[in-house]
Amino acid sequence: MNPDAAPVELDLYQDVVMDHKRAPRHFGTLPEATHRARGRNPSCGDDVQVALDVAQGRIRDIRFSGQGCAICIASASMMSEAVHGKELAFARDLQQRFRGVLTGTLEPEDAALGKLVSLAGVRNYPSRIKCALLGWHALMHAIADQADKAESAAPADMAPPEQQP
C-alpha cells in the first residue's frame, strides 16, 4: 500500500478490513481437522485458534475461531480466504511475504498479496503488527504440527516455527 495513497484508497482498505471483522470468512470450528494450533497475545487479549483439514499437501478446509481486535480478526479472515484450497508451500510463502510487508523488509507492491495488501498500513503501527500476524503464527504452527508450541504468546518478530530457535 502506498503511504501517500489518496484518502479514497485508504477508505477502501479500511472498508475491506472492517468487512472482514464484521463478517469473518471461514470462522467457526472444524471437527474433522487434521492440524490445529492456537495463538495468544496476553498483552492485548487476542486469542485465535486455527484448524486445518490437510490432505496430500493441500489445505482442503480451514477454520479459525477466537476473539481479538479488528486487525487480528480481519487478518485471520483474509488469511483463511487466501490459503483455503491451496498447497501448504503456498501458505508458507504467503505468510513470509505478508510478514515481510508488515515488518518493512518487503514493499507491498512487490509482495503480490491480493486483498491482504489492505493490512499493509499496520506496519506504521508497530504495536499492532502482532495483532495482524497472530492468526498467521497459529497457521504456521498448525502446518508444522506444533499445536503445543503455539499455545503461548508469539515472539516479537512472529517468525514461523521452522525459523525459531
Predicted regions, residues:
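Structured beta-strand/loop patches that form or line metal/cofactor-binding pockets in enzymes
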Residues: 23-65
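Active-site phosphate/pyrophosphate-handling residues
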Residues: 48, 77, 130
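C-terminal binding/interaction regions
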Residues: 1-31, 60, 86-165
